[in-house]
């Protein structure tokens, strides 16, 4: 039996499977292990201002949620933001969908925005402003949110061998997940079915295969035969 090591970095929650064979995700590693240099700012800063051209950045702030519903409004989202409140997923925002109602008890909470730069604009009027990340105003219930902690997440530069894993328990926030599947159960080309996985990155046997996102048309990743040997 040839067991293959699968590593995921998941920014959005999802269900895990590999075609007809169930994936066994048994371990996790928190993203704190790949934090870059933290920047503190009263206002949101684009990724370029914290030294990130591509990839992911975590924006965090302490907020006070009023009684009743409170709408989170972001002026610019480039390109995708997974919104968490005290580690609980609230929803996702894009530059076409920049308002989200938060669900929480009144009081102090930690707002976490995991943001990915999906790519650069190469045509049209927005080419003059190719900033990525979050920038401009951020409001909760009409009130400006200040006091941001901005942290680069060095996901794609990670050497999987350097991560420290522990047994997988309840893990609601983005993290690395590691598991195995049986190569002997598949003949011919092997594809990883990523439909329903949310958003993240994939490594097999230490080899980086690429990213996935459930809003893209392609929902499978070909696993090269040479890394399954």
What are these regions (language model features)?
Residues 141-182:
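Compositionally biased low-complexity segments at domain edges in trafficked proteins
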Residues 59-61, 98-100, 177-179, 217-221:
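Short strand-edge motifs at loop-to-beta-strand transitions and within beta-strands
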Residues 100-108, 182-183, 220-229:
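Short, surface-exposed tryptophan/glycine-enriched loops
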Residues 116-146:
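Glycine/proline-rich low-complexity spacer/linker segments in large multi-domain proteins
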Residues 4-13:
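Sec-dependent N-terminal signal peptides
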Residues 90-91, 145, 209-210:
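Short, isolated positions in well-ordered beta-strands
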Residues 19-128, 160-163:
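Carbohydrate-binding surfaces of carbohydrate-active enzymes
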Residues 69-84, 111, 181-205, 212-213:
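Aromatic-lined ligand-binding clefts that engage carbohydrates, nucleic acids, or primary amines
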């Amino acid at each position: 039996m040839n067991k293959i090591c699968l590593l995921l970095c998941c920014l959005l929650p999802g269900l895990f499977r590999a075609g007809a064979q169930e994936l066994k995700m048994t371990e996790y590693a928190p993203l704190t292990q790949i934090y870059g240099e933290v920047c503190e700012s009263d206002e949101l800063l684009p990724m370029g201002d914290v030294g990130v051209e591509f990839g992911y950045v975590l924006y965090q702030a302490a907020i006070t949620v009023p009684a009743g519903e409170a709408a989170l409004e972001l002026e610019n989202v480039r390109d995708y933001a997974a919104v968490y409140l005290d580690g609980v997923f609230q929803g996702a925002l894009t530059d076409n969908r920049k308002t989200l109602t938060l669900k929480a008890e009144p009081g102090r909470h930690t707002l976490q925005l995991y943001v990915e730069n999906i790519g650069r604009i190469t045509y049209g009027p927005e080419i003059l402003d190719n900033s990525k990340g979050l920038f401009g105003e951020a409001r909760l219930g009409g009130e400006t949110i200040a006091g941001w902690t901005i942290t680069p997440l060095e996901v794609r530069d990670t050497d999987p061998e350097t991560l420290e894993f522990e047994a997988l328990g309840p893990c609601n926030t983005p993290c690395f997940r590691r598991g195995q599947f049986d190569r002997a159960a598949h003949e011919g080309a092997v594809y990883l079915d990523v439909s329903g996985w949310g958003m993240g990155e994939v490594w097999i046997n230490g080899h980086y295969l690429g990213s996935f996102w459930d809003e893209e048309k392609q929902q499978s990743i070909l696993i090269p035969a040479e890394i399954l040997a």
